Amino acid sequence: SSSILCDCEAGLDRYVGPGGDESVSTPDGRPGAIIQLHIPKFWKDPKKLEKAALVRISQNILTCPTASCFNLMDDAESYFKLGKKVAFFGNKYQKRIERFGRKMWWIPILGGEFIMDRRLGYADGLMGGNLWYFGKNTESALKAAEKGVEAILPIPNVITTFPGGIAGSGSKAGSDYDFTIASTYEKFCPLLQKDPSVEGALPEGVNSVMEIIMNGKDMDSIITATQAAIEASKETEDLLMISAGNYNGKLGKSFIYLHPDKQPS
């Protein structure tokens, strides 16, 4: 999902516990998953993150058979009392409980029970890390991007939010239409390079551009993911170049360099 038109950007960080990253245990000892939700800081409204989390938990986690919902950020200074809001699904049969040494809400459901921590913490993260893959054809650009995503998946604290981790419709900020905030990046559309109204910017021979977008817990996580993706994909056949969208520095103050030796320490 993209915050261009969605309520947040969400994705799977990693599986944890049995069968996953066993350095992280779940409160109930079962297999689990860490999920990240992000909204842009320029929205300046944490309540939008709370609403997005409420909708996603209520519709995607509460409904999932045998699932529970735990707060990973126990030390976070900021938090939402989301457990109480989700618990209203219990229609007055819900109740406060303590389990696994945690303060939780208990909701009776047809499958048995759903339990959830009373509070979910939140903190600043990083959005919009990206890589562009310039291919001789669609197959090469897509194959390179797929290799990049595969390398990112095992890295902790990072998510890729688009289908399969890849965007085939990379956008620019702004539009000629006032009802949307982003639009196709015509300078980099292969089929518009000969359009006289477009100032084409694609290198010679490029016929497809695929993009990976990364969000994460912090700068170091995104840097690690970026370098892993580049290393895994750079030798792809018919891949002509790897670059990234800078957007004239308008979308944020954090800069990640594709050449690791140029990244400030």
Where are these regions (language model features)?
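Glycine-rich phosphate/pyrophosphate-binding loop regions near the starts of catalytic domains
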Residues: S23-Q36
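Conserved mixed alpha/beta catalytic, RNA-binding, or beta-rich assembly cores of soluble enzyme
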Residues: S1-V24, I39-F42, P46, K51-V209, ...
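C-terminal binding/interaction regions
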Residues: S233
